Design a protein with these regions (language model features):
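A structural microfeature
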Residues: 146-148, 173, 213
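A short beta-loop-alpha structural element at the N-terminal edge
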Residues: 1-4, 106-117
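A conserved beta-strand-loop-helix scaffold within acyl/acetyltransferase catalytic domains
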Residues: 38, 127-165
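N-terminal charged segments
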Residues: 1-68, 72-77, 119-123, 127-132
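Conserved catalytic-core motifs of GNAT/GCN5-like acyltransferases
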Residues: 85-98, 192, 210-226
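Conserved active-site alpha-helix within GNAT-family acetyltransferase domains
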Residues: 73-84, 195-213
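Conserved acetyl-CoA-binding loop-helix of GNAT-fold acetyltransferases
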Residues: 51-59, 163, 169-183, 198-206
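Conserved GNAT acetyl-CoA-binding A-motif
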Residues: 61-73, 184-196, 215
Length: 226
């Protein structure tokens, strides 16, 4: 079965390892195709060594609104079809972290007074409000002033890292990541970075995070929901 062939300890499949650590369904697991569905994040993780018509028909039948795969050919094929009208499509690199977590009292649940600022600096107000309501949005405060923020996404990854412009290049980004790894240590953590986000990639490299050899390809309509 294909699932048994994946190196789940590799950064390439950290997203699948996260799905397996929670509530999920195995939709398909053959020698050349795998479809997992997370009951938590509602994402379909699809892997295949052979893109056949039966696999495509299965995906059309499932009609996923949130799909991820490391197969770039499948990504391109699904990007061009009309049966699954994905609104958003992008590729990212995936990282796993060494033992750098450090408890930091500066990181705490985002204060409600700072929620409008976060909404203004993130692409989706609805998703930010969901993260906030589920205590998955953390602020980094120095002398009660918000320096930056980070999120624990519903798929298990940490991301949406943001440092206010006036506080950049002062080491806060690294401090926020390390603090988040400690704060969310009860689940397998990883991060995903859009392939052209060179600033974030350099940050992960400076933290000696292990980088995937493949790209994680995302297709989605309305994104995560709780």
């Amino acid at each position: 079965m294909l699932l048994d062939q994946l190196s789940l300890c590799s950064p390439d499949y950290a997203h699948i390892n996260a799905i397996l650590s929670g509530s999920y369904e195995t939709i398909l697991n053959t020698n050349n195709a795998l479809i997992l569905y997370s009951n938590i994040s509602h994402v379909y993780a699809v892997e295949t060594t052979n893109i056949c018509e039966s696999l495509l028909q299965k995906l059309y039948q499932l009609s996923p609104r949130l799909l991820e795969t490391t197969n770039e050919t499948l990504f391109q094929q699904l990007s061009c079809q009309n049966q699954l009208p994905f609104e958003h499509k992008y590729k990212c690199l995936q990282f796993t972290f060494p033992d750098i977590a450090g408890k930091d009292s500066h990181l705490e649940p985002l204060h409600s007074a700072d929620l409008p600022y976060v909404i203004d600096t993130y692409e989706s107000e609805a998703y930010i409000r969901q993260l906030f309501s589920h205590n998955r949005l953390m602020g980094y405060y120095v002398n009660s002033v918000l320096i930056g923020y980070i999120a624990h996404h519903i798929d298990g990854s940490i991301g949406a890292l943001y440092v206010k412009p006036e506080y950049r290049n002062k080491g806060y980004a690294s401090a926020i990541v390390k603090a988040a790894l400690s704060a969310f240590a009860d689940s397998p953590l990883f991060s995903q970075v859009i392939e052209d986000n060179t600033v974030s990639i350099r940050l992960h490299e400076a933290l000696h995070a292990a980088k995937s050899d493949v790209k994680i390809c995302w297709l989605y309509d309305d994104g995560f929901s709780f």
